[in-house]
Amino acid sequence: MTSTNEPIPTEEEIKNGFKFIQDEICKFLITTTGGHQQYSEDKWDYTKGSGGGISRVWEGKEEEGFYLNQDYQSQNNKCDKIEKGGVNFSYIVGSNLPSAAATQFKIAPDTKYIATGVSLVIHPYNPNVPTIHMNVRYFEAGDVWWFGGGVDLTPVYPKLDQVVEFHSTLKKVCDQYGQEENKTSYALGKAECDSYFFLPHRGETRGVGGLFFDHLKSDKAKTWKFIYQLGLSFIDLYKPFLVNNSSISYDKVQREYQLYRRSRYVEFNLLFDRGTKFGILSEGRTESILMSLPAVCKWKYNYKPEENTPEANLLTFLRPRDWLNENQENKN
């Protein structure tokens, strides 16, 4: 199915669009974190074909106890806000699809393929600022093509009104640029996200969800417009958390709980994440694939937070909920 109203995007337009998304998000992160915390840039070449990528990575200071001083954290605007983060752009072209990936996608192994997109993860220092992940991508092999992507939020100390606003912003993007017939509606994307970002061995979701889309292959022009706008929406989605929550003081208990909860993030990425599996199977760039992992995390044996604590409150958020219809009288 093709659109009769809009021109079909070219490979070059899609590539340049993703690069623009990376640039805009990086500008936003630098400005919003005060301008002093810069990323390191790593340009790399795809050795098994042509193309490559640009990885932009933030790694904060590592002094022990540096981010446990409440007065410093709440008053000094020069404090690093991103402990570990990255915004990666890639565009690769190969002449032979790796056999493992070919089997997964039911494509002949000797088929030329193109893969491009932007992937990002931000792990903040402050436990009151959620971790966020976003991915927008395009894949083409022979006559087969599709778009995919999504965004999801992983808070440690969630506030209901902020979670509702996050989902409201996502719904606005879907209402304006998505289509039910193109499988890019908010309802479908949210349901897929709740299902995908689930840890079966823990019986909980990774966070408070968001949107997840994969193998979108209907109406290339409209789907590209949706994916492009979804990528740019990151700024509106994350700005309230980064601006409003970074100045909230926190103590050692909260920092320790943040590190403990990050272990769930690592478990999901290494055990279940399709992007990680595909990257490894397709002999992708390991540094870029594992960029999403936090700098520090902890596991505690059989740990359970005490009842009626902010730490226990998080667990009530880690299940699929109809966020847009939550009772605002029960704000946390």
Curated annotation (Swiss-Prot):
BP-aspect Gene Ontology terms: protoporphyrinogen IX biosynthetic process
Binding-site residues, coproporphyrinogen III: 119, 135-137, 284-285
Class of the enzyme per the UniProt entry, highest EC level: oxidoreductase
InterPro entries hit by this protein: Coprogen_oxidase_aer, Coprogen_oxidase_aer_sf
Active site: 133 (proton donor)
EC number(s) stated in the UniProt entry for this protein: 1.3.3.3
Pathway: Porphyrin-containing compound metabolism; protoporphyrin-IX biosynthesis; protoporphyrinogen-IX from coproporphyrinogen-III (O2 route): step 1/1
Catalytic reactions of this protein: coproporphyrinogen III + O2 + 2 H(+) = protoporphyrinogen IX + 2 CO2 + 2 H2O
Molecular functions per Gene Ontology: coproporphyrinogen oxidase activity
Keywords of this entry: Heme biosynthesis, Oxidoreductase, Porphyrin biosynthesis
Gene Ontology cellular component terms for the protein in this record: cytoplasm
Source domain of life: Eukaryota
SUPFAM superfamilies found in the cross-reference section: Coproporphyrinogen III oxidase
Protein's job: Involved in the heme biosynthesis. Catalyzes the aerobic oxidative decarboxylation of propionate groups of rings A and B of coproporphyrinogen-III to yield the vinyl groups in protoporphyrinogen-IX.
Protein family membership: Belongs to the aerobic coproporphyrinogen-III oxidase family.
Self-association state and partner proteins as the record states: Homodimer.
Identification of the protein by name: Oxygen-dependent coproporphyrinogen-III oxidase
Source organism of this protein record: Dictyostelium discoideum (Social amoeba)
Species lineage: Eukaryota, Amoebozoa, Evosea, Eumycetozoa, Dictyostelia
